[in-house]
Amino acid sequence: MFSLQEICRKNIYLLPDWLGEHVVQRLGLYWKKHGTLQRIGDDYVLIQQDLIIPINEALRMAGEEGNDEVIELLLLWEGNIYYAIIGALEGDHDSLAYKLYSQIRDCHNILPLIQDPKIFEKCHDLDESCNISCLVLNAVKHDMLCILQEYKMLLSGGDIQEVFETACRSQKYDIVTWMGQNIAIYNPGVIFDIAFDKMNVSLLSIGYTLLFEHHINNMIENNMDTNSLLMQHLEWAASTGFLHFMLETLKYGGDVTIIELSAAVKYDHRKVLDYFLRRKKLPRETLEKLLLLAICEACSKKTLNLLLSYLNYSVDNIRKKILQYVKQYETTLIIKILWKKRKINLIDPILADFVGYHSYTYLINFMREFSIYPERIIKMAARVAREDLVIKFSKKVCKDPIDRLNYLKTLVYTMRHKAGKRVLIYTIHNLYKASYLESKEMFKLARFYARHDATFQFISICHDLSKLNIDIKNLLSECLEIAIKNNYPQLIKAIKMDMNYE
């Protein structure tokens, strides 16, 4: 055929009325017994100016009739060759089917388009490299149970297992049920694994039906009894949050215990927890264990609130445990919830521990989260000799060194812990050494040291004043009175020695 005719055949969408039947036939736009063929858009054809059908349906019809020329034309119009092959198989035009198949060399993409089991099998036979097992596997995927029934005796044990698993994964429930009831399967219990993997409760139900109603005992491995299997399934379902799986399993036995509830807590499945906590009257000790587990696993605020609500937010029995777990797992959400809901204060005891070993950055965030004043943390830091925290937090409060020094002095006045007070004074003195104070301020600081029995720091600042040739006799006399009044023997001795040198 000339290339011009080929171009015309491919691109003519509207035949002129004046074209006679002979010309149309010569152009190859005529379908014997049907009439003229005309392309309509990209997906349809018009037959004899009367009937519009999809191109692929026309291809199937042409294949069934064995009409090579029309098939060639429709393929030129971008029809799908798969339908021509199906039609050729339906019309028993095997040579035409093989001829068309030679252009694609893979039958498996055609199979989903076939409804008739006989044509399905004939199509699969076009691929000479495929075997019976491949045919049955594809039949299962496409709901052709009759093919499985026909060839079941030709399948090996391994093939049967593969077919059964394929049916399960493809969710072909009728085939799964039929195989479970009629064919010896090496490991039918795999249906449960696939049910959980696919989150498919229908497969789970079929598995239980086969186990309990048809008594297929090899569904359970490792000599496990049925109750143990059900409890295992309940724990799996709880850990994955599949409440509907748990309810399906409970139809056949088993019970929800602390093991299953713990699995739900561990993986933060609040829906499962809420359902069973509402329906089971659990002992308080069990609820407390679940709450402690939730703290360990850093569960969400909603899960913690749910468990606390069943305890009526009363945690007196496990207060020490909560503090231990908060410290161990570095989670403070439970403390925040208890404070907001019931004003239960666990902040103070845990803060004392946190100040002992946590970083400045962590404590800054903790301080913001619980609205804690910096001086509270500074005093706690002083008690445990965390001078680094004292310096950083005081610097956060007062940027100016002199202001910072005065700020720390005010904290010393309210500090009762002796060792903590010494840490603050030590920090103040280091800050003084790194700053420049006028003599008037130095006198004030010396009196401050005297009032708090800071002998070493008092001697140090007096020596600094002496180096500046500042008369400190009156200062020494005043501070001696303070030392005598408060009975500070070391300070008294040090002042008297200084007075002898002045």
Curated annotation (Swiss-Prot):
Q: Which UniProt keywords apply?
A: Early protein
Query: Which parts pass through the membrane?
Result: none
Write down the superkingdom of origin. Answer: Viruses
The record's induction entry says: Expressed in the early phase of the viral replicative cycle.
Task: Please tell me whether the keyword Transferase is annotated for this protein.
Answer: no
* Signal sequence region: none
> Does Ribonucleoprotein count among this protein's keywords?
no
By sequence similarity, the record places it as follows: Belongs to the asfivirus MGF 505 family.
Function, please?
A: Plays a role in virus cell tropism, and may be required for efficient virus replication in macrophages.
Protein name, UniProt field: Protein MGF 505-5R
**Which species is this UniProt entry from?**
African swine fever virus (isolate Pig/Kenya/KEN-50/1950)
